[in-house]
């Protein structure tokens, strides 16, 4: 009944297994990949014909994590998986980016790839396993896919690269100074296709070494998929790339001159309008059959690409007049919004980001519910890309995959320089509003985010800047690396290479390559140019702000104290009674962590002090020999009970009330009276013994022995 194909190798200290033929047999390609005890199933289906008139490649990738994979039940009212989490969205993009360029040019049939996590051992990250499963499923499906690809995660600890570090090592990257890198790489046998990383100020050489290490480490996986496909692959889909040479030749002859003139216009919107006019002029001269040809859009793109790329390769001139190494003009401004905690307006050419920082308390932290367990994040970065930023009418609604991905890239770039939570106990939310875009808006978010946080008073370890690099690589081997690319250069070029970091090193690297043939020499040149660009941008940013401003007057003040964990219950009280009383009485917000760290927040310093004192009175232990102010709560024949330390009471024996003989404490005391007492010690049952007669009730100072003797002699 089942025709099962199964292959296994030892890889990175774990067993990697690929299996097909038993599950999801009606899909065009189905593979279950297992690394350790983490199993991921990838299923590929594709339409056998393209939709009429379709001029793009409709590839859809869905990565989904099932809670049962880790033995968990989903939270929420409905108790089932709902919309994709941020991690699922990011992993979907992680799978999509390296495989999309590997489909045969001209293939426009719809392809659906669904990747599902079936089992998670909480050691091996499922994203790498998912990429391998997806690659294998595509390779055996028969779809015209020029793979396979392999994938690997690379860490860097103690000066050594580490293949596929454990989940725990990566989850607490920010808290572990030994672990300085989380890099995911994907590629074919001969070429790197995609890199995604967060780093802690690594040098260009260290980052390039990580890329090389990862590419070498994935080679056994690629060989395994090839062997696997030789036994399990379906018949290749009968597809021949369309021949549109005649159509392209006609489009070129009719409109190359006008299109070239349009690309010579430096202002983006004027250039866009001129390109649209050139297209319209060409279309006006085409026949109905040529206008209906589904390859017309491809022919236009090829013409535009040849003009832009040829000018750069042959003359070194870009469409906005810059050479290949120049960064566009930069204007940085801070404190642009009066009532926000921190704000910055970062403008680089025709790309602009308005970035705002808000400081919150512990209750504002994001709770992340993941397969490996719940966690909290005190740093949030949200990226918004409205249609008006590119002068268009378009979809407006919740953030899409691109916005989530760009926001995460900026998050990775900035989180490496954040202060430790113990030094700066705030939740930090950064929002980047892209108000203009002509390339590299995510890197503008990094620059604006750094300025905005410093404007809010966040003590960053160092300012961070980012730059997007591009590449033109021709078939004859000529190439050029471009610094600070425009939108058209991104669209028509061969590489999108984003680098962010400080003066000391790289904090984030993202690379997407559309062609094979990217050599180490090209990558070295790109990293070197990116460093020069980053240093220039940091210099321009420093003109606006070079270090953290004074703390925003509108941000909440936070003080922390650490208490013994066995005292947490006392601070919270039965049913939360005590903590509610503290909050209501003081007016401050109080957040208690399981490790005994308490954060007290308020805009009013007096409220913070009140809450602090109330908590301290509960958890602190009174010291023998110290003098305290208390209140008489009860009088009995043998003495007075005094509340002197938070909710703690002690007994002042009748003999310790005054320097004279008393028959009853009510001769000198009454309930509710404020008194000064000295802690004499504890009896054999642990009860507190207090004294009054040795304390001056007016000053609260201890009466010196000589004075006490004189008082006693006078009374005698």
Swiss-Prot record:
Domain S1 motif, chain residue ranges per copy: 625-693
GO cellular component entries: cytosol
Superkingdom of origin: Bacteria
Cofactor: Mg(2+)
Enzyme Commission code: 2.7.7.8
Region annotation (Disordered) ranges: 695-716
InterPro entries per the UniProt record, alphabetical: ExoRNase_PH_dom1 (IPR001247), ExoRNase_PH_dom2 (IPR015847), ExoRNase_PH_dom2_sf (IPR036345), KH_dom (IPR004087), KH_dom_type_1 (IPR004088), KH_dom_type_1_sf (IPR036612), NA-bd_OB-fold (IPR012340), PNPase (IPR012162)
GO terms, molecular function: 3'-5'-RNA exonuclease activity; magnesium ion binding; polyribonucleotide nucleotidyltransferase activity; RNA binding
The KH domain, residue ranges: 556-615
Keywords, in A-Z order: Cytoplasm, Magnesium, Metal-binding, Nucleotidyltransferase, RNA-binding, Transferase
Record localization: Cytoplasm
GO terms (BP aspect): mRNA catabolic process; RNA processing
Family: Belongs to the polyribonucleotide nucleotidyltransferase family.
Job of this protein: Involved in mRNA degradation. Catalyzes the phosphorolysis of single-stranded polyribonucleotides processively in the 3'- to 5'-direction.
Designated name of the protein: Polyribonucleotide nucleotidyltransferase
